[in-house]
């Protein structure tokens, strides 16, 4: 419920210090991680849009393969201006809505706030750092199958871990406290080198998001067919090659086979870009394709297959995007 906030916040970074968490973009991913933290007793504040009334009145429900639960009352807000300053802010907005951050983020900021961008793509933090030069940023790379198809209800289908990559956080204690809180909430979380974290997720995202739209297929269908299975692997190797050209040597060609095995073990899933396409919403082409392809090209590495897929996605978006 929105309104005044309370909490016993200690003066130091000891055990008694209770961090305030803000969730900007309480969709499927932000809703899931925020709800898990709130269930563990953390002080979490949710910015909502279309389902504010539902959540403010009835709380937040998580239907999960790992155990469903309901939070009957949460700190729900319709306006960022009504939210308290937070120690950690999770941004779960789609990157097509980055232009909203200069309005949404400032009310939640303190001088030492850590902003974790749980968003798809490469180059996300650099773009946000230009908007907020002095804000501490980290990348949040969620490996999870989750959807939000009903107001106030998050459907958790599979997986659920998150990698955190430090982009510009100067406060080691803040980062350590975040990792401890995630663990306390039952969230499998690792702190990973920033560039490795972003490009590792891109190895999965760039093939599956785009191909799910271009071929109108879920993850299981893409891997069940010999031709599309081979294409998925070829695209993964192209992403790995780009990452290595940019100095991310921790990503090796063997990662493609591990990612495919990981996906085969998942429940059939429509990636977020496919859902955006189905609902005639803007797709996250810029940060998922355009920017990483441009970065690779600057390093002397071309991504011809993914450049073609990017062009197909631009064409599809132009045809299907709803007009005002």
What residues fall within each predicted segment?
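Short alpha-helical
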Residues: 50-54, 96-97, 122-123, 197
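NAD(P)-dependent Rossmann-like dehydrogenase/reductase catalytic/cofactor-binding core
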Residues: 16, 183, 233-324
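NAD(P)+-binding Rossmann beta1-loop-alpha1 motif at the extreme N-terminus of oxidoreductases
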Residues: 14-71
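Short, well-ordered alpha-helices that flank and scaffold nucleotide-derived cofactor binding pockets
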Residues: 35, 39, 103-107, 130, ...
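Internal alpha-helical scaffold of NAD(P)-dependent oxidoreductase catalytic cores
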Residues: 107-108, 130-136, 151-207, 213-251
């Amino acid at each position: 419920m929105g309104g005044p906030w309370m909490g016993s916040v200690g003066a130091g970074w000891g055990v008694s210090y209770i961090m305030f968490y803000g969730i900007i973009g309480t969709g499927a991913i932000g809703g899931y991680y925020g709800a898990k933290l709130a269930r563990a007793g953390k002080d979490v504040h949710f910015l909502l849009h279309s389902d504010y009334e539902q959540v403010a009145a009835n709380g937040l429900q998580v239907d999960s393969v790992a155990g469903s639960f309901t939070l009957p009352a949460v700190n729900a807000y319709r306006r960022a201006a009504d939210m308290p300053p937070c120690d950690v802010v999770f941004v779960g907005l789609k990157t097509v809505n980055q232009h909203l951050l200069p309005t949404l983020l400032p009310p939640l900021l303190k001088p030492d706030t850590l902003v974790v961008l749980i968003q798809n793509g490469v180059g996300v933090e650099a773009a946000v750092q230009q908007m907020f030069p002095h804000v501490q940023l980290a990348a949040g790379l969620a490996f999870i199958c989750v959807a939000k198809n009903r107001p106030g209800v998050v459907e958790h289908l599979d997986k659920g871990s998150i990698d955190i990559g430090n982009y510009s956080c100067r406060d080691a204690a803040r980062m350590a406290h975040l990792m401890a809180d995630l663990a306390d909430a039952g969230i499998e979380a690792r702190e990973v080198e920033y560039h490795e974290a972003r490009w590792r997720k891109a190895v999965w995202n760039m093939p599956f998001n785009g191909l799910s739209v271009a071929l109108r297929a879920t993850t299981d269908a893409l891997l069940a067919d010999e031709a599309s299975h081979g294409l998925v692997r070829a695209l993964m190797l192209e992403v790995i090659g780009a990452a290595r050209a940019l100095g991310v040597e921790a990503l090796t060609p063997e990662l493609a086979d591990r990612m495919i095995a990981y996906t085969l073990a998942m429940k059939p899933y429509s990636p977020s870009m496919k859902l955006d396409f189905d609902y005639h919403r803007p797709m996250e082409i810029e940060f998922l394709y355009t920017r990483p392809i441009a970065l690779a090209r600057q390093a002397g590495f071309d991504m011809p297959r993914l450049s073609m897929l990017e062009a197909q996605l631009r064409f599809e978006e132009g045809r299907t995007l709803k007009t005002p």
